[in-house]
């Protein structure tokens, strides 16, 4: 969860917006007791919350690439002033929308996340933790929808 004071710049003809918040409060809450005891999502082990103060830059760009094909690019960058300033958390969503015909459309989305505070465990075949560190997380989605107008 983010709470901050900032300013937004919009370029309507390019469908581009840039939000800059030099004072942003970021909170991470882990309500699952097992996960909070493990220190998941960057919270201290046994704690349910983590709070940070930093800078947030958020951009969104919508673009029609060709007829019936559009792109949306959303990028969010955050850096904590107090802990490891300069380590940038990245949240990037890239979506392509395809209108196939009057009844069918498809979406392809990639979602990339990197947060230095989130440590991912890699285990060997015996279940022993071999490495613990920040990793790039990537999710891809393909959606196909049927359109119907009343």
State each model region's role:
Residues 26-30, 76-84, 113-119:
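Sequence/structural signature of outer-membrane beta-barrel proteins
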Residues 1-54, 128-137:
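Outer-membrane pore/translocation modules
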Residues 14-18, 68-71, 103-108:
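Repeated loop/turn-to-beta-strand initiation elements of outer-membrane beta-barrel proteins
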Residues 51, 80-89, 136-137:
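Solvent-exposed loop/turn segments connecting transmembrane beta-strands
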Residues 3-9, 22-24, 55-63, 77, ...:
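Residues on the lipid-exposed face of transmembrane beta-strands in outer-membrane beta-barrel proteins
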Residues 30-37, 84-89, 119-126:
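Outer-membrane beta-barrel translocator domains and adjoining extracellular loop/strand segments
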Residues 136-150:
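Outer-membrane beta-barrel "beta-signal"
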Residues 62-81:
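Surface-exposed extracellular loop regions of Gram-negative outer-membrane beta-barrel proteins
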């Amino acid at each position: 969860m983010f709470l901050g004071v900032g300013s937004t710049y919009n370029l309507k003809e390019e469908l581009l917006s840039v939000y800059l918040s030099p004072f942003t409060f970021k909170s991470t809450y882990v309500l699952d007791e097992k996960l909070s005891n493990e220190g998941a999502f960057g919270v201290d082990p046994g704690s349910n919350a983590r709070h940070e103060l930093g800078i947030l830059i958020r951009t969104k760009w919508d673009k029609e690439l060709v007829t019936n094909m559009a792109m949306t690019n959303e990028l969010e960058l955050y850096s904590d002033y107090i802990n490891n300033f300069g380590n940038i958390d990245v949240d990037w969503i890239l979506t392509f929308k395809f209108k196939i015909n009057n009844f069918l459309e498809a979406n392809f989305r990639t979602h990339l996340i990197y947060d230095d505070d989130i440590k991912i465990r890699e285990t060997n075949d015996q279940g022993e933790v071999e490495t613990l560190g920040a990793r790039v997380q990537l999710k891809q989605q393909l959606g196909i929808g049927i359109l119907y107008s009343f």
